[in-house]
Amino acid sequence: MNNLLRCHQVCKTYQEGELQTQVLKGVSFELKRGELVSIIGSSGSGKSTLLHILGALDDASEGQVEFLGQSLHQLSSNKQAKIRNQHLGFVYQFHHLLADFSALENVAMPLLIGGMNVAKAKAKAQSLLERVGLGHRVAHRPSELSGGERQRVAIARALVNKPDLVLADEPTGNLDHKTALSIYDLMRELNRESGTAFLVVTHDGELAAKMDRHMHMKDGLLTDITGA
């Protein structure tokens, strides 16, 4: 089966008292293995909410998400956590690196959480940091790195477990345009090398166009799919 992810009629409604706000209004799409896909849309259109549901960080109010042939909402919390650790990678606009740990320790963290011994985890982290051009910065903490370097560390951390899919939420939102382009080029290179699929949320049309396929989200709906 070539489909990695299937999203069918996903809705999300938040309720505060008597007020209901529907953020997602029946989102459906499929993502193939190794595919590079972007979702573009303005702030508040539902992009980040969708990504949280796809990553098993939030539940849909209606609809279904299948990942690796499994319905995410039917899995226990422990099984969802295992999928996040072993099969999914996450990159955000803010890097969310641990401030008191070095680049090497940050990248090794998912491996250690998964039970790998320290020496092997650090060796894998070292190799991946070298691949993203930061072999000379492994001992530096996030405060000692530039914005682009911090995002490269975050991408390395997302890829260290060789996930099937990386979910990236505005990964270049805090970067200048030149650095943003380099981050997107890096994601394409890593995709070609590893076969990891990327689903990237952005508001930048030029960057979105670098993906194999790009979708447009407006008012909680995917209204346009191009490049398929």
Curated annotation (Swiss-Prot):
Q: Which residues bind ATP?
A: 41-48
**Which UniProt keywords are listed?**
ATP-binding, Cell inner membrane, Cell membrane, Membrane, Nucleotide-binding, Translocase, Transport
Q: Which CDD domains match?
A: ABC_MJ0796_LolCDE_FtsE (cd03255)
User: Where does this chain mainly localize?
Assistant: membrane
**Its biological purpose:** Part of the ABC transporter complex LolCDE involved in the translocation of mature outer membrane-directed lipoproteins, from the inner membrane to the periplasmic chaperone, LolA. Responsible for the formation of the LolA-lipoprotein complex in an ATP-dependent manner.
The entry assigns this protein to a family as follows: Belongs to the ABC transporter superfamily. Lipoprotein translocase (TC 3.A.1.125) family.
Put simply, this protein is called Lipoprotein-releasing system ATP-binding protein LolD
Organism, by scientific name, is Vibrio cholerae serotype O1 (strain ATCC 39315 / El Tor Inaba N16961)
Lineage here is: Bacteria, Pseudomonadati, Pseudomonadota, Gammaproteobacteria, Vibrionales
